[in-house]
Amino acid sequence: MTKNNLFAMLAIACAAVLCSCNQQKGETITLQVKTQYGILEGLEEDGVKKFLGVPFAQAPVGELRWKAPQPVQAWEGVREAKQFGDDPMQLDVFGDMAFRGSGRSEDCLYLNIWTTAATTADALPVLIYFNGGGLMAGSGSEPRYDGSSIAKEGVIGVTANYREGVFGFFAHPDLTAASDYKGSGNYGFLDQVAAIKWVKENIAAFGGDPNKITIVGESAGSFSVSLLMCSPLSKNLIAGAMLSSGAEVLPYQPSSQADADATGAELLKQAGIASLTDAMALNADPLQKLLPPRGMANVVLDGYFMTESADAVFEKNEQAQVPLLAGWNSLEAHPMQAIQGQAPTLQNYKNALKAQFGDMTDEIFKAYGIETDEDVMNQKGFDLVSDLFTGFPTWKVCDYHAKSGLPVYRYHYMHPRPQQSEKMGDKVAALAGGVREKTAEEKKAQQPTIAPGAVHSADIEYAMGTLDTNEYYDWQDEDYAISKLFLTYYANFCKTGNPNGEGLPQWTAITKENLDAAPVMKIDVESKEVASPEKENAYRTLEKFYRSKK
């Protein structure tokens, strides 16, 4: 071999090494990121790159109202992504939810991205959070869902809006007949699918791994995630799922398309709207006032988003084959909500629920260990009404999933929010996380300033590391410590499908072998794992009741 040939081969080898290094290093992520639809320009704060108000579908306005989301159209030049898009149209159902969007509009299909990735080669895991609010309120712009803290843990945070209320969950015979898939009513859920697809197609440009997407939601968002785990449109797009207080399985039931259509037609009639054409012609605000939300919508078996109930999918083990982390709070509901102003005695509690439980009332109360007046207002009494609201269906998804041989990590969040700050004034916390003015009766009553447990939605700021965004409470060191633990569990789960990590309380997965005494992480000042055969028996007893009514 000549010297020139040797030098030539060395040069080729060096070039190959440099090329390999560049490929491993990946492209540097700046504040301008090229997506499949155009260039976005974000901003950076405290070491986190933010891309806000990113369109993931066409605006569902005009002829696109009450249609499945359509692919976003490409744009030319650089599109600024420095402020949140409009929040979904909604009435103030739950009080002030502290939105950061510029207003409320049907043009609301935007997502937000928080990343600390330096290059595209970082391939960070991704967390997509779907907000709660009964499918009729809430937004991805709410500060409590902010992705900055999870981004600092090495996970790309994403929030995504979806249509709510009448705009997201209205079915009608004419809409069904006109759609390509001969269905209607699941528009908000289809928006969530579109958001996941957009992230999967584009997140690599932000330093994310499209094959490591975990979805999470609280309350209505959690119900949504349980459905997204089952929908043929989304179940193969995700690598993990987290449920926080809710799932659309037993006792919640889907609607048939025919029933949903009939309900929609009757709603128009009751509102004095002569036809779907007339409804389409109404502006958004008068429309939502004429057709206000009536509680959380049932998913419709539209033959597209859902072809059968989530229970049926889980029973056949046809749900997403991914790790699951799920739980609920210790005070999702209060016995006084059932007793309705009467004395909190055992007999009054039984009387309040007898219309629901019938002949199984005594058996269910015994299973929950509610045997004295004192039990009504302690954790035993809290557990029963909390399970009737969100606890039982969340438990049932865990039960289904573990029986399928898939890893399940279950928690029970126990820690109450601290003393309210002076900012709360004459306001009171609302159900879904907002605040509202106290009623005249509430102003007269001596209400405790610290709840006896973790109320519905109280976990969000802790789990997402966003305590400081909520100025209505006087957060203490123990709150920040719990938040750090919860956030780390979330981040670890997104990274590995397992929440455990060095220095954390050990969290054992539920398996087919330990179902009768399932391990549960009690998240509190002193977090620890417990197993209670008695509690599992209580859930089985409640399941027996629900199945007897099907």
Language model features with spans:
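Non-catalytic accessory segments of hydrolases
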Residues: 20-186, 210, 476-486, 496-506, ...
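Alpha/beta-hydrolase active-site loop
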Residues: 108, 181-204, 259-262
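Alpha/beta-hydrolase fold nucleophile elbow
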Residues: 206-218
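Short glycine-enriched nucleophile-adjacent loop
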Residues: 222-234
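Mobile gating loops/cap/lid regions near enzyme active sites that modulate substrate access
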Residues: 395, 399-550
